[in-house]
Amino acid sequence: MSDQKAITSEQEMKAYRVQGFTCANCAGKFEKNVKQLSGVEDAKVNFGASKIAVYGNATIEELEKAGAFENLKVTPEKSARQASQEVKEDTKEDKVPFYKKHSTLLYASLLIAFGYLSSYVNGEENIVTTLLFLASMFIGGLSLFKVGLQNLLRFEFDMKTLMTVAVIGGAIIGEWAEVAIVVILFAISEALERFSMDRARQSIRSLMDIAPKEALVKRNGQEIMIHVDDIAVGDIMIVKPGQKIAMDGVVVSGYSAVNQAAITGESVPVEKTVDNEVFAGTLNEEGLLEVEITKLVEDTTISKIIHLVEEAQGERAPSQAFVDKFAKYYTPIIMIIAALVAIVPPLFFDGSWETWIYQGLAVLVVGCPCALVISTPISIVSAIGNAAKKGVLVKGGVYLEEMGALKAIAFDKTGTLTKGVPAVTDYNVLNKQINEKELLSIITALEYRSQHPLASAIMKKAEEENITYSDVQVEDFSSITGKGIKGIVNGTTYYIGSPKLFKELLTNDFDKDLEQNVTTLQNQGKTAMIIGTEKEILAVIAVADEVRESSKEILQKLHQLGIKKTIMLTGDNKGTANAIGGQVGVSDIEAELMPQDKLDFIKQLRSEYGNVAMVGDGVNDAPALAASTVGIAMGGAGTDTALETADVALMGDDLRKLPFTVKLSRKTLNIIKANITFAIAIKFIALLLVIPGWLTLWIAILSDMGATLLVALNGLRLMRVKE
C-alpha cells in the first residue's frame, strides 16, 4: 500500500454534492484545488454524479473557495429525507426555462444584434458599434475571462485559457464583431454541454424517487404514517393494493402480486406471500401485505443501487483515461501551433502580421478540446443510467467497455442456465390398472416424510395436479440408506428408490425395456426414481433441475451479437452436463469441475480469447467471477453479495437482460470511439484550412460548438437503447 493510500484510509471520508460543473476539465481543476487545502489529504471528484469525496477536514466555505473559478456550490451528502427534498429542488431547477437560467447570455446576444444593426447604420468603425460589441463580449464572457486570466498567470493551459488568449488577441487587432460572436457561441456551447450532462445525470437522480418517502407502520396498536428515515428494523409496514413499497422487508401476512420492474427490470408481477422478500420501490398490485422491515432506508436494495451507480459513474473508462492523457499534452501543443502560425509566415515568408495573427487566434479557438473532453463522460453516464433503469447494475465505464469487447462468456449451470430448483419432468405409470392420481398421492405422502433433496419436486408436482396427500396414512416409514425409502399404506409396503434398490428387491430379472428407459432418462440429465412393491414396479418418476425457458433463446442472441464462444461450467457428471448443454445450445461443456477447476478454466479462456465474462450467482462462483474480465452475477436484487462482488449485476433472477447488456456495451464502445474520432477529425480538418488562409474565427468557433453539440447528442442516444 502506498503512503498516500495509507493516509487516505486513515482519514474520514466525507461526500459532497457539487452544483455548477460545466465540463470535465473544470471538475479536474476543482479536485486539484481541493487537494491543495491544508486539512485535506486526498480528494476525488465524480464528474458523472456531480460529487466529491474529501479525505480529511475542510469546511464548505473552503471547498466553495476552491471552486470559486466556476462559482461552484457545495452541499453535504443528504439523508433520505434531505435527498428527497433535494431531488424535488433539482426537478424544479430543471423546469426553469433555458433562457432564464442563462439570462446574461440572452442580454449579450441582444447586444450583438444591436451591434450588427449599428454596424449596418453607422459603420464598423463607429464608437457606438464598438461599444455594443465590447459590452456583449464582457457580459457574455466575464466568467470566461476571470478563469482564463487566472490560468494564464499560473501558466495553466485549458480550453478557457485558449479562448481568453484568442479573445484578447482578436480585440487587439480590432476584430470586435467576430470576438463577440466567439464569446457568445462559446458560452452557448458550454451551456449546451452542461444541459446534456444534466440530462444524463437526471436518469440516475430519478432513481431516488422510485421508493415512497413515507410508509404506513403499525406502532403501539395504531397505524401511522412515518418518514422512512424514522422506520426501524422490525417495524411492521402495511402496504395496500396499488401502493409502492417503501422499505425492504419480509412478508408476515397477506398475499399479492408485486411488480418488481423498478428493481429487476421484470415486467411480469411476482407472487408474494408469507416469508417472501419484497423491495423498496416495487409496486404492490393486488392484495394487502404486512411486511416486517429488515433494512434501514440507507441499506435498502434501491439505495445500494443508487450508491453503486453513482460510484460507477466516477470510475474512469480506458477511453476516458486516454482522453485525459491526450488533453494534458494537446492544449499546450495547440498554443505552440497557434504561436507558430502567427509568427512564422510574417517573419520568414513576408506574410501580413495582421492576417497571420488572426489565423493564429483562429487556431486557438478551433483547438478548444470541449468536444473531446465530453465525448466519453456523456456516453458512460447515459449508458449506466439506461442500464440501471432496466434492471442491470454496471459498476463502471471500464466494465461497459470490456463488455463491449467480449469474445467468450462462461456460464455456471445450476441456477444460471437452469432454474436451480428440481422439478418432475416425467411420470410414467407402468401398471395401467392403477389410478395415476391415487398413486401420486401415495408417493407424495411417502416423500413428505423424507429428507431427500428431490422430495420437494414431487410435492410441487402434487400441488400442481391438485392432489391431496395429507389424509394418506403412512405406517412404519423408514429410510433405506443410499437407496431410497419405504412405508406401509393401506396394508401394502411401497418402495421409492434407485434402480439398484429394485434389482435387489425383485426376485425376477429387471425388465430390459424398463432398464433402457431409465438409462435414457439418465442420459438426458435426469434422476430416475422407481416406485413399486416387493413384487412389481408400478411407476417411474424422473426429476431434473429444469432448464430456464429463456436460456436457449438468450444463447442464440449472444451468438448473433458476435460472442464467439459460450461455455457451460458445472460440477455435475458428464451425462447431465451434456444433456443440459445440448438443450441450451452452448458451444462447449466442461463437467465434473471443482471450484479451483472453474478458476483455472477461466484463466485458460482469458489467455485464448482475451475478454471473457463469467456468469454465476455471485456467491459460489466468486473466484471464477473475480478471475474473469467481467464478472456477471444474477439475482442481484436478492443478495448483497452479488451487488458487492460482481462487476455487473443482473437484478432479476434470469438471463434475459444479458443480451441487452452486451448490446448496450457494444453500442457504448462504438459511440465513444466515434465521438473521439469525430472530435479529433473536425479539429484536424479545420486546422488544414490554415494552409490556404481560409480559417476564420467564425469557422473555428462553429466547428468547435458543432462538434461539442453533435458529440453530446450522440452520447445521449445511449439513454434510448432498448432491449
Curated annotation (Swiss-Prot):
MF (Gene Ontology): ATP binding; ATP hydrolysis activity; metal ion binding; P-type cadmium transporter activity
Entry's Gene Ontology BP terms: response to cadmium ion
Residues holding Cd(2+): 23, 26
SUPFAM superfamilies for this protein: Calcium ATPase, transduction domain A (SSF81653), Calcium ATPase, transmembrane domain M (SSF81665), HAD-like (SSF56784), HMA, heavy metal-associated domain (SSF55008)
Protein's membrane topology: Multi-pass membrane protein
InterPro entries: ATPase_P-typ_cyto_dom_N (IPR023299), ATPase_P-typ_P_site (IPR018303), ATPase_P-typ_TM_dom_sf (IPR023298), ATPase_P-typ_transduc_dom_A_sf (IPR008250), Cation_Transport_ATPase_IB (IPR051014), HAD-like_sf (IPR036412), HAD_sf (IPR023214), Heavy-metal-associated_CS (IPR017969)
Transmembrane region(s): 103-123, 127-147, 168-188, 329-349, 361-381, 671-690, 694-716
Alphabetical list of PROSITE patterns matching this protein: ATPASE_E1_E2, HMA_1, HMA_2
Compartments in which it is found: Cell membrane
Gene Ontology CC terms: plasma membrane
Active site: 412 (4-aspartylphosphate intermediate)
Gene3D superfamilies named in the record: 3.30.70.100, Calcium-transporting ATPase, cytoplasmic domain N (3.40.1110.10), Calcium-transporting ATPase, cytoplasmic transduction domain A (2.70.150.10), HAD superfamily/HAD-like (3.40.50.1000)
Keywords per UniProt: ATP-binding, Cadmium, Cadmium resistance, Cell membrane, Ion transport, Magnesium, Membrane, Metal-binding, Nucleotide-binding, Phosphoprotein, Plasmid, Translocase, Transmembrane, Transmembrane helix, Transport
Catalytic activity: Cd(2+)(in) + ATP + H2O = Cd(2+)(out) + ADP + phosphate + H(+)
UniProt EC number: 7.2.2.21
Domain HMA: 12-75
Family: Belongs to the cation transport ATPase (P-type) (TC 3.A.3) family. Type IB subfamily.
Role, per record: Couples the hydrolysis of ATP with the export of cadmium.
Protein name: Probable cadmium-transporting ATPase
Organism: Alkalihalophilus pseudofirmus (strain ATCC BAA-2126 / JCM 17055 / OF4)
